[in-house]
Amino acid sequence: SPVFADRYVFVGYPGGKLVALAIQNGAPVWEGAVALPKGATELDRVADVVAPPAIDGRLICAVAFQGRVACFDMGQGGALIWARDISSASGLALDGRYLFVTDDKGVVYGLDRLSGSSLWKQDKLLNRRISAPAVRRGNVAVADAQGIVHFLSREDGSFVARQKTDGTPVRTSVQPLGSGFLVQTSGGNVSLIEPQ
């Protein structure tokens, strides 16, 4: 999905590209490499930006499947600030201090948003088809294929709480709303959940 900020529309493309387009005429303004396709087969070379980029101030970050997470400076013509080899099929979230990303195996990372250095890693959700993270009031929320929303501490990635939904998979991204998180399951249930 495109993301709008300032005078630009930001779009992730197959091949691992993040492109800034001018809102007034759609002309490309700059392009950044989130991932560089590599591998022997065409399937190995899939490195698509699969989730909307996240923006905080001048910082824009994106993640690619079979690629990496990368952050760019919008004020410097899309100059690469940092990149880390983390593949994700779900996405990422930013707040004032951290970048949170779920990798394609179900590991959730807390990274320094300005340097990309690891602050914490939560690997106890492996192979649960974890959603993109969402952050609100010190909690990072991710949902899984069993319909469970897991709340992690923003500071160290430890588990804070868990909430069950209707038991069907959460197929959409968790969305911060008010003091909680909006969750939609494949069973059609929409819930506003707060960590308890």
For each of these PLM feature ranges, what is it?
Residues 1-6, 28-55, 79-95, 119-137, ...:
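Extracytoplasmic beta-rich repeat domains
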Residues 6, 13-14, 64-65, 103-104, ...:
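Structural signature of WD-repeat beta-propellers
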Residues 19, 70, 109-110, 150, ...:
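WD40 beta-propeller blade core
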Residues 22-26, 73-77, 112-115, 153-157, ...:
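Short loop/turn segments that connect beta-strands within beta-propeller blades
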Residues 63, 68-69, 76-108:
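N-terminal leader/targeting helix
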Residues 98-113, 117-151:
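Loop/turn-rich, solvent-exposed surfaces of beta-rich toroidal or solenoidal domains
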Residues 144-188, 195-196:
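C-terminal closing repeat unit and adjoining cap/tail of repeat-based domains
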